[in-house]
Amino acid sequence: MKKMIPALLAVSLSLGAMPLMAAESVVIKPLRNAPSDFIKGADISTLLEVERQGSVFYDENHVRVDPVALLKKNGVNYIRLRLWVDPHDAAGRPYGGGDNDLATTLALAKRVKAAGMKLLLDFHYSDFWTDPGKQFKPKAWANLSYDQLKIAIHDYTRDTIARFKKEGVLPDMVQIGNETNGGMLWPEGKSWGQGGGEFDRLAGLLNAAIAGLRENLSSPGQVKIMLHLAEGTKNDTFRWWFDEITKRGVPFDVIGLSMYTYWDGPISKLKANMDDISQRYNKDVIVVEAAYGYTPANCDNAENSFGEKEAAAGGYPATVQGQADFVRDLMQSVIDVPKKRGKGVFYWEPTWITPPGNTWATEAGMNYINDHWKLGNARENQALFNCQGEVLPSIKVFK
């Protein structure tokens, strides 16, 4: 990770350099053989919180716009939204990172559907961030037995989807867990290191959640089901996990992959993995998380996850053109998966910029996940808007 940039210097950098970046032009190589229904998606889960904290967004003419409408105008056709169970502590203090409780996620879902885009709902089954290194149970489920957890995840999924359906925003696709390499609802649903039977228990939880989802559907295929792993270049991980899950008959339609070249390696390795797993399991594949920095500069006091080191490792320059090239090449790799199994790409958090008070986690949130780090946004230089909310030309890669 790169050295911290002091806050005053970071602000001066953002005020000086980043508006110029919004005026840069980019050259985008056309996609080959892109299907008309190819998913050009974005995860905008932090948007409502960012707006509540004072951020506004501008188009290329510096006209204030609704960023959802601007994404749609530039070709984005599918939106991913995460959902946490109760992202607040006992005193009601929010955890940050978007504050993605049911009310927040429903409000965003209504904007998505009103704009004419499709919706992917990402169940984390936790009160805050989940990934391969952490899968904390919701506070309300902390003392439940395994059998009780199966009931809880079934009922929660059923009731949540029923609410979305009632509000007229039934998702088009649902993700059962987020980056579940290590399983979910630890320790009962952990996929390793629990003395045996790990995948039996994990499959039981997944099946319970899927059954809850399907209670709201007119047919099993009405809403696509995705299972999602991180580290999209690691074929051995995907084979290990999905071999075990398919042995146990867990029903799903799509394999989701996270892909950050600066952590995971080149797109060519992702492509090889997608080619293999799409045929091995006879499933569609979607890159459901991906992002790249348009600058190594920083806009706040939190060290960014993308800096000079990541730019050197990521395979593309840390420029607006480099960002656009990354997204274009990633989409092409998915399109090129054999037998038309590659269905799309979701860009992660293109609208996550840095209004005052914005943070990946508050102190309350850090306490919940037991991860204490500097307050602030570590991702703003991978957005598709600069830190003043001006859209970057790289957004045109979705057209």
Please give the residue ranges for each predicted region.
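Substrate-binding cleft and catalytic face of glycoside hydrolase catalytic domains
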Residues: 70-225, 230
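Acidic-and-aromatic substrate-binding clefts and catalytic sites of carbohydrate-active enzymes
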Residues: 50-51, 55-62, 87-90, 95-103, ...
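Active-site beta-loop-alpha junctions enriched in small/polar residues
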Residues: 44-47, 84-86, 124-128, 176-181, ...
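N-terminal carbohydrate-binding accessory modules
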Residues: 22-76
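Glycoside hydrolase catalytic-domain groove-lining segments
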Residues: 61, 65-68, 200, 214-225, ...
